[in-house]
Structure formats: structure tokens, C-alpha cells
């Protein structure tokens, strides 16, 4: 009798220990992982990068907040197949990375690792007219600018959705920024919602109508036709 009682006393702690050990994984499995804030990279392939914070807010209507659930990127104008793409559809193609420095006419600059799709690939998907002269870009806040079709199709110009390996923040132009390399910052349109292929080579965007060069080349004058 004493031997059975001793066995019972010994087994009870063991049972509780097993129950306790078995319950921990279940409790842990029930917890969802906590999503932490994405951290930008500050160097890439040996090159130092600026921060996403090294920009000045100078948009015409303040920071825009685009709802990804309702966002559409329209590709229209002189195309055979007009497109209205969700964010997922827009980036569901070959993605590219490139370090490009944005230079503002205000005198500051920022060197960023951009990631996105080639504008040319989007134009090809829509069946653009190669005889067209101009591509007009429109932003969520109504801002517009234009660039020659030859510039966009002859160079690896990106429509970026990431900078320094993090999604572009609202204040930097989410969901898309045009990486208009070798052009002044006012050509780097943010919050892009529409890409229109046109024959209107005389089109002037917001800053161009206010005296800035329509060419926007870093090697050319800031002001002028």
C-alpha cells in the first residue's frame, strides 16, 4: 500500500509537467507574428545611399494617401489596348533595380536604390503607337508632366514602387514614382495614376506652364521652352 502511494506521489508531478510542456506550443502557435516596420538599406553593391527622409516635401497639394485597394494605373491614349491595372497587376512583370540620384532645382539631391517596372514594358503591354511623340503622366493630386516617347522607350526608365528596398512611403509618392533619370526633380512625378501616349509634343505640365524647361534635362537650362 505504501509502495503504491509513493508511486502515485511520484507520478502526479510528472503528469503536471507533461501537461504544462504540452500546452506551451499550442499557446505559442495561436499567436500571430508581429509585423515590424520595414528598414531601408543605406548601401548597395558598395555604393552609399541617401535616406528616404532626405527629401523635401514640395508637392502642389501636400502628401497624398492612395488606397491600394481601389488604386488603378491607367494606360491610355494612342494604344491598341487601354489598360486599367491594379497595383498587383502593374508590378506583375519583370522587376528591375537601379541606383539613381534625384536632383532638385532647389539645390538638394538624394541617391536612392529604386525598384520597379520599366515604363517601356507597360507601354508595350498596352500596344503603344511607336509613331507617337509624347507621354503624359498624371498624378493623384492632379500634377502632370510629360516626356518624349523616345526617351522612355530608349532608356531603362523605371516606374518605381520601392526605394531602398522598402515600399515607397506616402510622402514620397506611393504607390509609384517615375524615376526620370538625367532629368530635374520636377519630372519625377509622384503618385502616378495615368500614363497617356500622345502626339502633343507641345504639352506642358504643371511646372512647365510656370516657366520651367519642358525638356527638363540636367544638362540644359532650368527655365525656358
Predicted regions and their residues:
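Well-ordered, non-transmembrane segments within structured domains
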Residues: 2-3, 83-103, 132, 211-215, ...
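Mid-length scaffold segments of soluble, non-membrane domains
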Residues: 93-147
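Stable alpha-helical elements in mature extracytoplasmic
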Residues: 71, 83, 115-118, 122, ...
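Bacterial N-terminal signal peptides that target proteins for export
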Residues: 1-9
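Short acidic (Asp/Glu) patches
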Residues: 86-88, 120, 162
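A glycine-rich, hydrophobic loop/mini-helix early in the fold
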Residues: 64-113
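Extended, aromatic/histidine-rich regions of cofactor-dependent oxidoreductases associated
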Residues: 3, 19-73, 125-225
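Bacterial N-terminal signal peptides
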Residues: 9-17
Amino acid at each position: 500500500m505504501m509502495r503504491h502511494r509513493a508511486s502515485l506521489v511520484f507520478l502526479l508531478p510528472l503528469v503536471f509537467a507533461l501537461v504544462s510542456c504540452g500546452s506551451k506550443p499550442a499557446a505559442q502557435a495561436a499567436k500571430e507574428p508581429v509585423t515590424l516596420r520595414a528598414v531601408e538599406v543605406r548601401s548597395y553593391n558598395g555604393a552609399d545611399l541617401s535616406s528616404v527622409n532626405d527629401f523635401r516635401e514640395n508637392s502642389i497639394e501636400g502628401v497624398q494617401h492612395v488606397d491600394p485597394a481601389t488604386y488603378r494605373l491607367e494606360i491610355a491614349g494612342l494604344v491598341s489596348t487601354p489598360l486599367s491595372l491594379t497595383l498587383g497587376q502593374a508590378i506583375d512583370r519583370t522587376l528591375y533595380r537601379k541606383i539613381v540620384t534625384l536632383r532638385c532645382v532647389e539645390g538638394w539631391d538624394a541617391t536612392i536604390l529604386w525598384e520597379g517596372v520599366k515604363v517601356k514594358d507597360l507601354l508595350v503591354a498596352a500596344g503603344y503607337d511607336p509613331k507617337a511623340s509624347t507621354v503624359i503622366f498624371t498624378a493623384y493630386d492632379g500634377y502632370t508632366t510629360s516626356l518624349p516617347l523616345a526617351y522612355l522607350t530608349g532608356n531603362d526608365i523605371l516606374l518605381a514602387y520601392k526605394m531602398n528596398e522598402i515600399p515607397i512611403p506616402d510622402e514620397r509618392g506611393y504607390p509609384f514614382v517615375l524615376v526620370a533619370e538625367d532629368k530635374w526633380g520636377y519630372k519625377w512625378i509622384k503618385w502616378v495614376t495615368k500614363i497617356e501616349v500622345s502626339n502633343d509634343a507641345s504639352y506642358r505640365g504643371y511646372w512647365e506652364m510656370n516657366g520651367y524647361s519642358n525638356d527638363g534635362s540636367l544638362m540644359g537650362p532650368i527655365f525656358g521652352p
